[in-house]
Amino acid sequence: MIAEKPFWVKHEGLQIFSIDVQPNGERFATGGGDHKVRIWNMKSVDKDLQNIDTKERLLATLRDHFGSVNCVRWAKNSRYVASGSDDQVIQIHERKPGSGTTEFGSGEAPDVENWKAVMTLRGHTADVVDLNWSPDDSMLASGSLDNTVHIWNMRTGMCTTVLRGHLSLVKGVTWDPIGSFIASQSDDKTVIIWRTSDWGMAHRTDGHWAKSLGSTFFRRLGWSPCGHFLTTTHGFQKPKHSAPVLERGEWSVAYDFLGHSAPIIVVRFNHSMFKRIPSSTHETKQVGWSNGTSKSGEKDLQSYNVIAMGSQDRTITVWTTGSARPLFVAKHFFGQSVVDLSWSPDGYSLFACSLDGTVAMIHFDPKELGVRLTDTELDELKKSRYGDVRGRQANLVESPAQLLLETASTKQAGSKRAASDVQQNQVTTKPSVSVESTAKRRKSQVDDRNKAAESTGQTLNKASTLNRVSSPVNQKVYRRPDGRKRIIPEAVGVPQQENNIMINGESHNFLPASAAAPAKGDSGDFPVEISNRDLSGKEIVCRNPDLKERSRITARATITESLVIEKVPGTSGRDGVLNVEQSVGIKESSSTDLLIRVFDWKDGEAAPPVCLEACPREHALDTVGAVSTSMVKETEISCKKSGETLWSDRIMGRVTVLAGNPNFWAAGCEDGSLQVYTKCGRRAMPTMMMGSAATFIDCDDSWKLLLVTRKGSLYVWDLFNRKCVLHDSLSSLVSSDVNLSSTVKGTIKVISVKLSKSGSPLVVLATRHAFLFDTSLMCWLRVADDCFPASNFSSSWNLGSAPCGELAGLQVDVRKYMARKPGWNRITDDGTQTRAHLESQLASSLALESPNEYRQCLLAYVRFLAREADESRLREVCESFLGPPTGMAEAASSDTNLSWDPYVLGVKKHKLLRNDILPAMASNRKVQRLLNEFIDLLSEYEDVETADPAPKGSTPTMNCGGVPSSLDQIGSDPPAMTATTPMTIDNDKPVSLENPAALDIGVCEKTGSEDRDKQDQNSRDSGS
């Protein structure tokens, strides 16, 4: 026996939590407190090869974790290495061709080998402390401090199931070498045996750990290579600590390994079984077989297991199942607890690591351990006991369709993962509406933007570099009862960036624009930028709160103010009973200019934008006979294109908000008035009085205008038909939570009000809760909130990537806001919150009429139900997409209450069922009978149903909420309506100047001229 401690195996002087030897014997990996996984050359510690080049000792350093690496485990095929960390993430690394790299500024030499992360497994809500691969490497089990064990499908990277049953921290997990069971051990002093056939609980044992004392980092239990014994940790049999051994089948404790003076942290069986070398009794006694009492003969041919144990008493013991005493005891090797062990592939070398940051290797001789059984002999032994175990852990396929859909499900998951990677690595350029102080042509705008980027490049690069720095990390430090330090990284919020970037970007299609002037208040908000100028021409940058406006870029030209609404006690919440204040980041100034810019692509792609500017003016007014003069405040509104003034007007008072599109312009004033202009600058209607100053304004790409006043009144008008579509108050959003303080209760702060893509009003509060008004239900729907912090899908909204949809943008805002809160952290979920979160997201995407996000949420929801084997909810989902029973369609269609729409958001439900839902259900064979049932039903429907016409792509003229009866196809945009192409014209009411049902914006004149032409033609015909 040879023992050594290589001094160069270290993690920058920090603790080493895990060690594992590659099954092919070429490398071994360690994980430590420096957040890194290090891969070492096995030849550097080989007892026969001591003269290896020192540069080839450390082969690679993996730096993808952001917390201490608690566990590293090699796959059986030696291709992958898995690592679990305090950052709640599991990384799977694979060696790639080429040479390695190094971290910039680390001072370390470049890696000899190139190892890259090929898969990241997210789902745990606390530290991942133990990992174990299945016998065929198809699955990975992970134990975590969130009290759960996750089972991962390594073909797709998806979580197959979550095993819940422990009441405290899960600190050890191991896979049965036969593949039929998984065992886990927890701080609740229990060991649970799980079946892999249906992931149910086979047995719970809790008696032999009830008297255990103290606490340990890990409880790493181990299964014998023959599959018959399960050795656990942290047992206690007075007066010594023990390792109870469970026997397969009855799962009762057969015996204990007794002798350590402190809790046992880790046990590790040798990969192989051994036989004794035939020898004399004298030689046998020297190696300690059964305390020297064994006899030569048949017992020499019996195979036995070898097991190593590491304890908190800083010692290592090696035992055999044929002896009541340890074969080997290693003392004074380490200064702290032994936390992990690993055997070499040949079975004669033991690797150990300790919390003191060192590693030890112990090389045994065949005379000490015995003769190792070959792999063939071990397989024959298992086959004689359990039969052919290949594929035993898998459920049998009951139909060919199951295999086809499993293949489709794998491709579906792979494409989703690839799309996610592309989204994280790309910066998507999206159309925008800009606000700036000039109206140059596009080419000059691009040139100006490039010049501005060059002049501010150094500042921006510095800011972006600061934002990318991952350390130092905000941490919370406390000490456990045993004196050990516990460090928990806190969630890092998004920094408040001081971006002074002017918006000169290109816009690829028409979008409306809106802007607002600043008002008095505090400076605690996070405003977005609009461009303002004082009378001297110097440009002022104002930042305003709403982070995701319809322009869909970070720096937008939209509403600037936040609105605080407080309900007066004892009132009903109507207009006039609201206490209101406003708050923004800068003081009110009478010299603030407003400017919006609108692109109209009817004039060509290279056409310059049309700019509307509101400039406050003050001048003295001399009154005849009066001694003194008075100052008159008014606002000059001018519309320009390519530097040429198209029209101008003057309004008494100060303009606070502007909005416009190619059909109309609107200006709201602080005295509560609203003026609407035609695109040519004519006043389309008398001044509208709202009763209080306008604070938020928005418009769509046709004739819809939204306005919110300082009193909290919300209006939505159809200007083309001169009617109010919606008049409601934001007071219904005032919280009445009894748990809130008296200063907060009955008060809301609104930071954004806009028209959603579905045409419904969308309100975002300072808490980042988002509300959508549904005119069908006549109430507000909360489509984004922070009610599901424990959901496994709460972290799926990437805070750094560009959101791919309206709902995703709202959820990212919620996550950013929650990350800013001190002490915010994820909590454990029992599955209920995750399911409720997905159901809420599914309903919200439907209300927002976001087809792509609806499909994504639907797939995630079905996969979750399939993973949980929730057949009742899966059946309900499938039935809702399948439709009424075959042959009942006519009866159902005659009754409007039983009518069934075959389309959802423009997509045929049967297509979603066939292409998305059923393949997602195929991920778990436990529900394959339900899957086959709906495959047959769908085939029957497709045989008897007639071809349904495709849904019309027209968008309803006015729709402020709910799901319209006529929906667009996925990805299509509603057609932009112009002044000469109204959406609807009532033929019973001729459009003329006397008809108040039509807005006088160019349509009346055209229609009147057409009528006169027809009258002239009729008179000529009668005359002839």
Swiss-Prot record:
Q: Where in the cell is it found?
A: Nucleus; Nucleus, Nucleolus
| Residue stretches in coiled coil | 923-946
Keyword set includes rRNA-binding = no
Basic and acidic residues compositional bias, start-end: 1007-1024
One GO BP: chromatin remodeling
Q: Where are the WD repeats?
A: 10-50, 64-103, 123-162, 165-204, 214-256, 279-329, 333-374, 570-609, 649-687, 689-727, 745-790, 869-910
Disordered: where is this region? 409-460, 983-1024
InterPro entries of this UniProt entry?
CAF1B_HIR1_beta-prop, HIR1-like, HIRA-like_C, WD40/YVTN_repeat-like_dom_sf, WD40_repeat_CS, WD40_repeat_dom_sf, WD40_rpt
Any one Gene Ontology cellular component term annotated for this protein: rDNA protrusion
Q: Where is the composition biased (Polar residues)?
A: 421-437
Query: Which keywords belong to this entry?
Result: Chromatin regulator, Coiled coil, Nucleus, Repeat, Repressor, Transcription, Transcription regulation, WD repeat
Q: Explain the consequences of disrupting this gene.
A: Plants are embryo lethal when homozygous. Retarded root growth. Abnormal gene expression reprogramming during dedifferentiation in root-derived protoplasts. Reduced fertility leading to less seeds production. Reduced histone H3 levels and decreases nucleosome occupancy at both actively transcribed genes and heterochromatic regions.
Which tissues express it?
Expressed in the meristem and developing leaf primordia.
> Family assignment?
Belongs to the WD repeat HIR1 family.
What does the record note on quaternary structure?
Answer: Component of the HIRA complex made of UBN1, UBN2, ASF1A, CABIN1 and HIRA. Binds to histone H3.3, UBN1, UBN2 and ASF1A. Interacts with AS1.
User: Any idea what job this protein has?
Assistant: Histone chaperone involved in maintining knox genes silencing throughout leaf development. Involved in heterochromatic and euchromatic gene silencing, especially upon salt stress. Involved in gene expression reprogramming during dedifferentiation probably by modifying histone H3.3 recruitment at the nucleolus. Contributes to maintenance of silencing of pericentromeric repeats and certain transposons.
Q: What is this protein called?
A: Protein HIRA
Q: Which organism is it from?
A: Arabidopsis thaliana (Mouse-ear cress)
- Identify the taxonomic lineage of the organism of origin: Eukaryota, Viridiplantae, Streptophyta, Embryophyta, Tracheophyta
